[in-house]
């Protein structure tokens, strides 16, 4: 086969010209004839039994060309792609240039291909320094959060509601005198100051007592998920049934044992909490360094225009992964769109906004894998399978069936590229930054 690839100037697309040899064409025509004659009736012959010569006299061999092409084109195109070593990212647009009897057929394919990446600096780059210090105040705040979680709610009598109290209410909302879906409830428990209701709603209940009726006037935010309510003024008729206040436990050894069965004293709980906070800060710092360093590596690289097909694929993949995550939490796509007051197109636009950056990042990381000759060993692949099996509670054989060796190798190599970029980065404070 003869194939030629011509890339458009500074673009991730071009024209692939290729031929289909006569032997391959004839085999395709033979197969097309066998299938076609089953469908036609010629006087003097049983259906499906017309001889080839008679068929050619009546219909012409050229009538089989399109069916023959459909049979031989996929393999011919794939061979041309392999011969020219290009990486298509979408279905090609095929054009027939020559289809003559007894001659190779000549075709062209307009193809979007993987963009070329010219790496810039990606090692030893400066990134903002990360503070991983865990202070006593951090530990105190964490313990206070645990206290709040262990608090008991006790009935508050003859005292008005304050921030932090929980009120049990009935409410009914209306806009322009008309009630709306989801705007009413009975015996609803609401913590004042939690920010779980529309801005201003909770504040207007502070200072009121049990058994009071309160008119609450609010304005829905402009970006409110229910588009029919966004930016509109609303009136809520509220009945306060009960007011409850938090009763916090003492910060002592008994409290420590209640929140963590593995400790016996408050001192042990503080030490364990500090270690947990340190691990969290270290992980956050690592992620921040990775993001900053990789973003710089992407900015330093020269990347050709990204084909729309790659952006669309990324957007659809991200959206499906997100909806699958919702499904695991018991929220179907239909339920999600109903709850959020959005449509599938809205979610797609949300993920499309960052598609270009995600695709560029993947392209640069793959280029770094090649540039640094990164690879995945059999031992690393085996460990990856073992780790995934433990993470998802699966048998290792099930992981092997779900994920191909190539997929596992790709993930390992990409992680190595991330580590290479991040581990070589230099943390600098604002007053120490250079031009790097």
UniProtKB/Swiss-Prot annotation:
InterPro entries reported for this sequence: PPIase_dom_sf (IPR046357), PPIase_FKBP_dom (IPR001179), Trig_fac (IPR005215), Trigger_fac_C (IPR008880), Trigger_fac_C_sf (IPR037041), Trigger_fac_ribosome-bd_bac (IPR008881), Trigger_fac_ribosome-bd_sf (IPR036611), Trigger_fact/SurA_dom_sf (IPR027304)
PROSITE patterns with a match to the protein in the record: FKBP_PPIASE
Enzyme category, top tier: isomerase
Keyword Coiled coil recorded: no
Keyword Amino-acid biosynthesis: no
A Pfam family it matches: FKBP_C
Keywords per UniProt: Cell cycle, Cell division, Chaperone, Cytoplasm, Isomerase, Rotamase
Residues of the PPIase FKBP-type domain: 164-249
EC number: 5.2.1.8
Biological process according to GO: 'de novo' cotranslational protein folding; cell division; chaperone-mediated protein folding; protein transport; protein unfolding
Locations listed in the record: Cytoplasm
GO cellular component terms, A-Z: cytoplasm
Record GO terms (molecular function): peptidyl-prolyl cis-trans isomerase activity; protein folding chaperone; ribosome binding
HAMAP family given in the database record: Trigger_factor_Tig
Function: Involved in protein export. Acts as a chaperone by maintaining the newly synthesized protein in an open conformation. Functions as a peptidyl-prolyl cis-trans isomerase.
Domain remark text: Consists of 3 domains; the N-terminus binds the ribosome, the middle domain has PPIase activity, while the C-terminus has intrinsic chaperone activity on its own.
Record family assignment: Belongs to the FKBP-type PPIase family. Tig subfamily.
Name of the protein this chain belongs to: Trigger factor
Taxon lineage: Bacteria, Bacillati, Bacillota, Bacilli, Lactobacillales
């Amino acid at each position: 086969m003869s194939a030629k690839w011509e890339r458009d100037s500074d673009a991730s697309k071009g024209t692939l010209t290729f031929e289909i040899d006569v032997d391959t064409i004839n085999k395709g025509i033979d197969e097309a004839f066998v299938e076609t004659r089953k469908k036609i009736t010629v006087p003097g012959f049983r259906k499906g039994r017309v001889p080839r010569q008679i068929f050619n006299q009546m219909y012409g061999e050229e009538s089989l060309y399109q069916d023959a092409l459909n049979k031989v084109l996929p393999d011919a195109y794939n061979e041309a792609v392999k011969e020219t070593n290009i990486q298509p990212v979408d279905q090609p647009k095929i054009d027939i240039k020559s289809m003559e009897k007894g001659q190779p057929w000549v075709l062209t394919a307009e193809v979007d291909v993987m963009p070329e990446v010219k790496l810039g600096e990606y090692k030893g780059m400066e990134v903002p320094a990360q503070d991983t210090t865990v202070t006593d105040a951090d530990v105190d705040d964490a313990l206070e959060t645990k206290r709040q979680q262990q608090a008991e709610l006790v009935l508050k009598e003859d005292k008005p509601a304050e921030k932090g109290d929980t009120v049990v209410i009935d409410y009914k909302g209306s806009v322009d005198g008309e009630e709306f879906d989801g705007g009413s409830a009975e015996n609803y428990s609401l913590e004042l100051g939690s920010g779980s209701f529309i801005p201003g709603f909770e504040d207007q209940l502070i200072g009121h007592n049990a058994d009071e009726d309160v008119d609450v006037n609010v304005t829905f935010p402009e970006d409110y998920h229910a588009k029919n309510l966004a930016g509109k003024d609303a009136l809520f008729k509220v009945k306060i049934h009960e007011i409850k206040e938090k009763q916090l436990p003492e910060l002592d050894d008994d409290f420590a044992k209640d929140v963590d069965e593995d400790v016996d004293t408050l001192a042990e709980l503080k030490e364990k909490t500090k270690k947990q906070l340190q691990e969290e800060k270290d992980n956050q710092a690592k992620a921040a360094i990775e993001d900053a360093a990789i973003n710089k590596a992407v900015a330093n690289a020269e990347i050709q225009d990204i084909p729309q097909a790659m952006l669309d694929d990324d957007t659809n993949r991200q959206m499906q992964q997100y909806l699958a995550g919702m499904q695991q939490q018991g929220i179907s796509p239909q339920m999600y769109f109903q709850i959020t007051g959005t449509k599938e197109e809205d979610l797609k636009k949300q993920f499309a906004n960052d598609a270009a950056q995600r695709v560029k990042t993947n392209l640069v990381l793959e280029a770094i894998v090649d540039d640094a000759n990164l690879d995945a060993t059999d031992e690393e692949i085996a460990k990856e399978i073992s780790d995934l099996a433990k993470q998802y509670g699966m048998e290792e054989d099930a992981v092997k069936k779900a994920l191909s060796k190539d997929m596992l190798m790709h993930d390992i190599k990409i992680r190595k590229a991330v580590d290479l970029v991040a581990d070589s980065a230099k943390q600098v404070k604002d007053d120490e930054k250079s031009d790097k």
